Amino acid sequence: MAFAVSVQSHFAIRALKRDHFKNPSPRTFCSCFKSRPDSSYLSLKERTCFVSKPGLVTTRYRHIFQVGAETGGEFADSGEVADSLASDAPESFSWSSVILPFIFPALGGLLFGYDIGATSGATLSLQSPALSGTTWFNFSPVQLGLVVSGSLYGALLGSISVYGVADFLGRRRELIIAAVLYLLGSLITGCAPDLNILLVGRLLYGFGIGLAMHGAPLYIAETCPSQIRGTLISLKELFIVLGILLGFSVGSFQIDVVGGWRYMYGFGTPVALLMGLGMWSLPASPRWLLLRAVQGKGQLQEYKEKAMLALSKLRGRPPGDKISEKLVDDAYLSVKTAYEDEKSGGNFLEVFQGPNLKALTIGGGLVLFQQITGQPSVLYYAGSILQTAGFSAAADATRVSVIIGVFKLLMTWVAVAKVDDLGRRPLLIGGVSGIALSLFLLSAYYKFLGGFPLVAVGALLLYVGCYQISFGPISWLMVSEIFPLRTRGRGISLAVLTNFGSNAIVTFAFSPLKEFLGAENLFLLFGGIALVSLLFVILVVPETKGLSLEEIESKILK
């Protein structure tokens, strides 16, 4: 699923930023969205609030995965300058003061991606009589599916559980707990004496994913200077893709070692420890402290003082400096306004009515097809697929997986560069067509072309490349654009849960279905679903390129 997370923030940032210049109405300024985690996945009650002057227009962002930088009430893209909280000029800062508050939360994303890449090699090692180092290596397809998807089910549970406690915990404590869960999950999985303990470790690790993918984008967005917020959030998502590549790479080095799967999963331990110690050294989010004050959880002046101390520490300024005091005063006003605005929102059932239902059909359909065309299987089972596709040596299969990871990273940048130039529909239609072709090629390889392993490699590269320019980023860009303002947060919440749930199911079902149907028929099935998704894109998905959020609602959702 992270799988789709590599550049979601970047595209949402660009889409929302565009509307400011085209139609800077009060409604545009109040645009809000929830982002994914990818995935990860923020509470409906969560938001980050910023004030833009003049006019003191308040913008609220409801997050599920992406958070962006604001400029004049909208998001600022990488490197662009946005209004500060305190004045019309950008907030002054030193890069040295923002590196650690970015790096430590971003490690949560890297560990998420790492699990995807490492699992690809670990499944080969675990099932090898010679390399597993265990007596319980002979997994059934269902058991293998549970091992691979265990972290995803844990992430789903974590993302649901955090809804009720996120405001109480705060972003810093949430990320510390996530690091502890990552640490325990890595240790338990790496040292597991049997399958049951292994599954417990996978579940705990996944629970950490759910918390980290919720807390990390919030902490980064709420603590970094506004003019670089978009850059840092985009880099945070890039950490997930780098994590996937790192997992593939570690797998390729450890695949020939007896019990190498233990090292693959255990590698997350020192990274999780670094993340936990790093978050422990950082202060709480100043905006979260102000939110607690607005919620009536303590004395206003006490929370304001804590927020000023936290902001001063984050910026490397003396405690209680005047700049931090002014920033906190302005931030408190925006948090209070946004909190009161949240109370006046519509009820949950509105998502299933009128134009909202049309938006849910478009957004929910895209994230559903994103997963059921087999995308999770290609990443989690890349090593196994390559091994059955002619690279019988586990080392060869894992090394080719690294090539796939590098190609995925490169195609991510292609998508970033072209999505606003070419539009959503052309990239979706072309990309999904390529996905269908690649799946049919994989089916043909297993059925007719077994003597040509390069066909399988080419098909996998084609799949990854086409996914990265279509479903991967554009599904979440469309989701961030398509919902009407009043129901945007709730609609994107449903889209995120649809994505996470379908991802877990597809990942679990791949191994049993491969055993039951055969690889050639399974990829043929995925190819057929890809054709259905192509038809869905052609008939249902509109072009939103160049349209403001208001124009999307008035012209497309009428």
UniProtKB/Swiss-Prot annotation:
Is Transmembrane helix there in the keyword field? Answer: yes
Q: Where are the transmembrane segments?
A: 98-118, 146-166, 175-195, 197-217, 238-258, 264-284, 359-379, 400-420, 426-446, 449-469, 491-511, 522-542
Q: Which GO terms describe its biological process?
A: D-glucose transmembrane transport
Q: Which Pfam families match?
A: Sugar_tr (PF00083)
Instruction: Give the Gene3D superfamilies listed for this entry.
Output: MFS general substrate transporter like domains
Transit peptide: which residues? 1-31
* Primary subcellular site in the record, as a coarse category: plastid
Q: Which InterPro entries match?
A: MFS_dom (IPR020846), MFS_sugar_transport-like (IPR005828), MFS_Sugar_Transporter (IPR050820), MFS_trans_sf (IPR036259), Sugar/inositol_transpt (IPR003663), Sugar_transporter_CS (IPR005829)
Cellular component annotations (GO), alphabetically ordered: chloroplast; chloroplast envelope; chloroplast membrane; plastid
Question: Which membrane topology describes this protein?
Answer: Multi-pass membrane protein
| Compartments where found | Plastid, Chloroplast membrane
Q: Can you tell which superkingdom this protein's organism belongs to?
A: Eukaryota
Molecular function GO terms recorded: transmembrane transporter activity
Per UniProt, the keywords (alphabetical) are:
Chloroplast, Membrane, Plastid, Sugar transport, Transit peptide, Transmembrane, Transmembrane helix, Transport
Q: What is the similarity comment for this entry?
A: Belongs to the major facilitator superfamily. Sugar transporter (TC 2.A.1.1) family.
NCBIfam families according to UniProt: SP (TIGR00879)
Q: What is this protein called?
A: D-xylose-proton symporter-like 3, chloroplastic
